[in-house]
C-alpha cells in the first residue's frame, strides 16, 4: 500500500512528465533504481538530448523543493545515469530538476524547471 508521500511523489512525476511531453519530449524510462541512486524520469528532448529528471514535490511553499537537490543528490544521479547509459550509443545528456509546489488550498501545481543543473538546483 502506498503512503501519502509516495502518492504525492507519483503525482509530481506525472505533472513533470506531462510538462516534457507538452514540449515534444519522449519518455524513455521512469523510476529507475540502482544501489547508487535513482532516476525519476528519463526523457529524450525534441532536440535529441537525453534528460535525466529529478522531481521534487511539496505541499505549500514553506519548503523550497529544489533545495533538496544538493551536490550529493546530483552525484548519485550522475552515477545512476552512467549505469543507465552503459551499452547505449553516445548521446548528449543533461540533468534537470523539476520543483513542484502544490497550493495547499486548491492543490494546483506550480512548476519550476531548472534545466542543465550541475551542482543541484538553487
From Swiss-Prot:
<dbReference type="InterPro" id="IPR011856">
    <property type="entry name" value="tRNA_endonuc-like_dom_sf"/>
</dbReference>
<dbReference type="GO" id="GO:0003676">
    <property type="term" value="F:nucleic acid binding"/>
</dbReference>
<dbReference type="InterPro" id="IPR011335">
    <property type="entry name" value="Restrct_endonuc-II-like"/>
</dbReference>
<dbReference type="Pfam" id="PF02021">
    <property type="entry name" value="UPF0102"/>
</dbReference>
<comment type="similarity">
    <text>Belongs to the UPF0102 family.</text>
</comment>
<protein>
    <recommendedName>
        <fullName>UPF0102 protein Cgl2031/cg2228</fullName>
    </recommendedName>
</protein>
<dbReference type="InterPro" id="IPR003509">
    <property type="entry name" value="UPF0102_YraN-like"/>
</dbReference>
Amino acid at each position: 500500500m502506498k503512503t501519502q508521500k509516495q502518492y504525492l511523489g507519483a503525482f509530481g512525476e506525472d505533472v513533470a512528465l506531462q510538462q516534457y511531453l507538452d514540449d515534444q519530449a519522449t519518455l524513455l524510462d521512469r523510476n529507475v533504481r540502482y544501489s547508487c541512486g535513482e532516476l525519476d524520469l528519463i526523457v529524450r528532448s525534441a532536440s535529441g538530448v537525453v534528460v535525466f529528471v529529478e522531481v521534487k514535490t511539496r505541499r505549500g511553499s514553506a519548503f523550497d523543493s529544489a533545495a533538496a537537490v544538493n551536490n550529493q543528490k546530483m552525484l548519485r544521479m550522475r552515477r545512476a545515469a552512467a549505469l543507465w547509459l552503459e551499452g547505449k550509443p553516445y548521446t548528449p545528456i543533461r540533468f534537470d530538476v523539476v520543483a513542484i509546489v502544490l497550493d495547499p488550498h486548491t492543490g494546483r501545481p506550480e512548476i519550476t524547471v531548472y534545466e542543465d543543473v550541475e551542482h543541484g538546483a538553487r
